[in-house]
């Protein structure tokens, strides 16, 4: 164990400080496609019974009208977070008339690009802005890539913990700056070690053959309808997914918060020639918000983000610049198609231990490690289960199995401290489940997907539809209690009323609104 990690764990293990570890906050966002009874993309509008996608706090859409996104409230106990997520699933599933929630991350068989419906958010200024932003995404990356779903895991350490660490370490940084620097250090370590998450939890080794739209790839044919890689863990996170030339040169530096903010500010204010050729309007209709490298900060695709809750009308980068980092959003997690919620308590508890390990361990600047971190991540998502696979650690080759075992050994102390804080041995059990996967790659979700498909003679689509139907049956057999059902129905109707009010109470025209939105970031740059 590193000296810094052991010192910090000892400090937090003191009787007066141990309860702090029960105050970490969690939130989960789960995306999933709506599909029809045959497993094809649902072309129906977002069900009105689910409320307004613009204003509902827990049920919205991501890119497509058919790509649902479920958002839990924050909780200190991740078991409560998963309980929240399950209730959202139960309600949503009960409102889908003959449709299913698609079980894996990679999409079902998709119609042609033109027929994939972009999510709509009504006629308010902000609703129209969200729609135009998505039109821009379609122009830049194509609609097919936008139909990939994932799980986002939001995590924060207790605010009271940072002054404790700062004082113990004699830091001269202001409290807010110390906290931000600590979160950026967590992110650097996440970049170093996130390949481990892809090995343990990657669950997308195969995809529908039509997904590539005829483009050449390294993928092999599993059957007539399915492409795969035999040792892949997460094709979703591989380079066949979300890459584009404009973002290729945009790798925000995680040396400190300011350099991260500066790189995003630059990207949202620097024109990109290919987008300039298109322009923002075609035949008088908006097609993208601007012609810059990024239309908005959230367009930048990354496996983890530093975050701060925004005020109304505030942009993410403004919130970070004004008040520092508040939490991290882990974005690289596949949906486990065997689980009704796509994630379970073992995974969540291990994530807590992993993220605390990243936060408390020594985290030097990445400098020359950046390319190794990227290469390791890509190697694992494409061939993480290959026997003898080697990664690079500090420039030297190391076998994945050896490095993974060492990391789990180091994470064990953090898991043990979490168990001391909460009572029981749940985090140790979650860690043991991951050790078993390192010892036997056949226990990983990616291997299990291929195993079941082979044993049952199923294509990716047939496997996924069967899982989706099984999950629908699970939710049907576990309906919400009447008071919970009523609460969700009330939330849905309140969100529809709120959207209607927004649409009534708006002044000015859309062009002016977009210009003001753009100026908010440009004003930040000039300050």
Curated annotation (Swiss-Prot):
GO cellular-component term (any): cytosol
Keywords annotated in UniProt: ATP-binding, Glutathione biosynthesis, Ligase, Nucleotide-binding
Gene Ontology terms for molecular function: ATP binding; glutamate-cysteine ligase activity; metal ion binding
E.C. numbers: 6.3.2.2
Residues annotated as signal peptide: none
One of the protein's GO biological processes: glutathione biosynthetic process
Similarity comment: family membership: Belongs to the glutamate--cysteine ligase type 1 family. Type 1 subfamily.
The protein's name in its UniProt record: Glutamate--cysteine ligase
Species, as recorded: Pseudomonas paraeruginosa (strain DSM 24068 / PA7)
Protein's gene: gshA
